[in-house]
């Protein structure tokens, strides 16, 4: 599998639910910024041609990475929402990326992506005309709450899944979906929702339960605990988490190009 897929990583958010002055994607974990593990997990797959990171205007915390594991890293200016940042990333991709090429979108603060899950998503998703997302079946019992905090009922869970990332779609279809949602004033919470609004049905590809998004201090502590259990990520070829020193040496920079909307 040759490098042909670009990944968009929206990283312009401030992570207000996490608290603190530093955006969660830059919080240290195992001696490296959290997002370093995210980008390394993507770059570990041979199908990756490059990564476009959408950052906030004036982001002083961006390390200026230009490559990870020889995979190019570019940046563009993100927007006020996740959807706006993803759209900016799609429009800022190099001219070599065609309209009907598949593009990945992955959360900046989802560092625990397994290489096997990414491989399965690409294998299944690229065989579908629409694309696919990583997801996990809902296993807990779901309760519907009333206005008073009491239980109004139990919801069937048999056909419910939790959406994860990465999500894989054709570039032109995702641009259209995000553009139409924005024009309609609809806030889409993931890329699949934008596709669904157009009547398209992406595939669900089961991913690991530990591909979690870091949104709270407890989530960060969980990821750090996993790194410790792995010897700060000392890994065999199947793991996506290099040892901290190895991870640091995998990144090149500073001096990453930052393109604004006026360059698109």
Swiss-Prot record:
Source organism superkingdom: Bacteria
GO MF: 2-C-methyl-D-erythritol 4-phosphate cytidylyltransferase activity
Pathway listed: Isoprenoid biosynthesis; isopentenyl diphosphate biosynthesis via DXP pathway; isopentenyl diphosphate from 1-deoxy-D-xylulose 5-phosphate: step 2/6
Family: Belongs to the IspD/TarI cytidylyltransferase family. IspD subfamily.
Keyword Transferase: yes
Protein name: 2-C-methyl-D-erythritol 4-phosphate cytidylyltransferase
Gene3D superfamilies, A to Z: Spore Coat Polysaccharide Biosynthesis Protein SpsA, Chain A
Species annotation: Xanthomonas euvesicatoria pv. vesicatoria (strain 85-10)
InterPro entries according to UniProt: IspD, IspD/TarI, IspD/TarI_cytidylyltransf_bact, ISPD_synthase_CS, Nucleotide-diphossugar_trans
Taxonomic lineage of the native organism: Bacteria, Pseudomonadati, Pseudomonadota, Gammaproteobacteria, Lysobacterales
Site (Transition state stabilizer): 17, 24
EC number: 2.7.7.60
Disulfide pattern: none
PROSITE patterns named in the record: ISPD (PS01295)
Catalytic activity, reaction form: 2-C-methyl-D-erythritol 4-phosphate + CTP + H(+) = 4-CDP-2-C-methyl-D-erythritol + diphosphate
Stretches the record annotates as Disordered: 234-264
Keyword Phosphoprotein: no
Function: Catalyzes the formation of 4-diphosphocytidyl-2-C-methyl-D-erythritol from CTP and 2-C-methyl-D-erythritol 4-phosphate (MEP).
One BP annotation, GO: isopentenyl diphosphate biosynthetic process, methylerythritol 4-phosphate pathway
One Pfam entry name: IspD
Residues the record marks as site: Positions MEP for the nucleophilic attack: 157, 213
């Amino acid at each position: 599998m040759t490098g042909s897929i670009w990944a968009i990583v929206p990283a312009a958010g401030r992570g207000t639910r996490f608290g603190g002055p530093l955006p969660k994607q830059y919080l240290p974990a195992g001696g490296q910024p959290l997002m370093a593990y995210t980008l390394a997990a993507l770059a570990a797959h041979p199908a990756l041609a490059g990564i476009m990171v959408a950052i906030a205007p004036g982001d002083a915390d961006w390390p200026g990475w230009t490559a990870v594991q020889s995979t190019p890293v570019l940046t563009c200016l993100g927007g006020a929402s996740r959807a706006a940042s993803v759209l900016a990333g799609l429009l800022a991709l190099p001219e070599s990326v065609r309209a009907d090429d598949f593009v990945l979108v992955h959360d900046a603060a989802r560092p625990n992506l397994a290489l096997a899950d990414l491989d399965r998503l690409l294998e299944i998703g690229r065989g579908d005309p629409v694309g696919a997302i990583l997801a996990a079946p809902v296993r807990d019992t779901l309760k519907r709450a009333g206005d008073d905090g009491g239980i109004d009922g139990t919801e069937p869970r048999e056909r419910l899944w939790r959406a994860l990332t990465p999500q894989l779609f054709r570039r032109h279809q995702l641009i259209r979906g995000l553009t139409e949602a924005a024009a309609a004033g609809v806030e889409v919470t993931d890329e699949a929702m934008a596709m669904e609004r157009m009547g398209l049905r992406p595939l669900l590809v089961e991913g690991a339960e530990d591909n979690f998004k870091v949104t709270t201090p407890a989530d960060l502590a969980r990821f750090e605990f996993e790194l410790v259990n792995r010897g700060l990520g000392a890994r065999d070829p199947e793991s996506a988490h290099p040892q901290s020193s190895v991870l640091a040496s995998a990144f090149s920079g500073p001096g990453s190009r930052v393109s604004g909307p006026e360059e698109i």
